Regions:
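PRPP-associated nucleotide enzymes
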Residues: 1-312
Length: 312
């Protein structure tokens, strides 16, 4: 991208709080946009200032999924029609990412469909974080900058100065992510093997590794109903763990997640602010990713390496 053209940052309804933090880090104003809602449930998007010839960055997580995704698509379309030089979708939480493959007959691949919708709407680049499946990047024919929340989580874990620490994953599918944490910190890795009878319900779980007398930090990407993460915490405490805390990138927290976290063995549940969390749960803490996304926008504009800012 050319350095001569200006860049502008705009936000959808869902991520304005994060966009404001990103703009504060960039020392630039948040662009003016009007989103009009109609009685029939439709809405319309208009830019309240000229974006002709500008590199436009649109900040919007797609959760709750449908309305925020549609809002983002309209933002992209309006920007292209207003002669923006380029349009970059900044999607901290990429909804539909758990629908990344056909795991049974006659089902859609939602992540691929969303990728197609964004591409057809006209984005030139995607900036996102901790996709549920890395291969989703291959659904796009444009550059995808895939950031990792480890850049904020690892310094936080180190600041706690925990002794007898082990890193754990609540399911085998997250072992690669947890393994990178354990290797970076130089501590053991513990796995949980779970089985489900149906979506959002964990039938059974077994621990693979030793947690007796250990301080456990569970690593995950998404916490939805919190059934898996809280069950893992409770089982580890029963197995002799000294304490259990959890860290996850995306705070979906569908009901009854807040209740489950509060009533569980977890001492704290730490997320990024990729998704706003308005419910009250004293155990929940959010770390901001605004500086990381601001730095990425700077590097995109300056044609600098993105991957060099990753910790892992």
């Amino acid at each position: 991208m050319s350095e001569k053209a200006p860049f502008m940052v705009f936000s959808g309804t869902n991520s304005r709080y994060l966009a404001e933090k990103i703009c504060a880090s960039l020392d630039c104003p948040l662009g003016n946009m009007n989103i009009t809602h109609f009685a029939d449930g439709e809405f319309a998007v208009s830019y309240e200032e000229s974006i002709r010839g500008a590199h436009v960055f649109l900040v919007q997580s797609t959760f709750p999924n449908s309305d925020n995704l549609m809002e983002l698509l309209l933002m992209i379309d309006a920007a292209k029609r207003a002669s923006a030089k380029s349009v970059v979708a900044v999607i901290p939480y990429f909804g539909w990412a758990r629908q990344d493959r056909k795991d049974k007959p006659r089902v859609s691949i939602g992540a691929k469909l969303v990728a197609d919708l964004l591409s057809v709407a006209g984005i030139d680049r995607l900036i996102t974080m901790d996709l549920h499946a890395d291969q989703i990047q291959g659904f796009f024919n444009i550059p995808v900058d895939h950031l990792y929340a480890s850049a904020v989580f690892l310094p936080y874990i180190q600041s706690l100065q925990l002794e007898n620490l082990v890193i754990a994953t609540p399911d085998v599918g997250g072992s690669k992510r947890a393994s990178t944490f354990s290797k970076y910190l130089g501590v053991p890795l513990v796995l949980c093997n779970k089985s489900r009878e149906k979506a959002n319900e964990v039938a059974s779980m077994q621990i693979i590794g030793d947690v007796e007398g250990k301080i456990v930090v569970l690593i995950d990407d998404i916490v939805d109903t919190a059934g898996t993460i809280t069950k893992a915490a409770n089982i580890m405490l029963e197995a002799g763990a000294q304490s259990v805390r959890a860290i996850a990138s995306h705070c979906v927290m569908s009901d009854p997640a807040s209740f489950r976290v509060q009533e569980s063995a977890l001492t704290e549940m730490v997320f990024t602010d990729s998704i706003p969390y308005a419910k009250k749960c004293p155990k929940v803490k959010q770390l901001s990713i605004a500086d990381m996304f601001a730095e990425t926008i700077k590097r995109v504009m300056n044609n600098e390496s993105i991957s060099s800012q990753y910790i892992i």
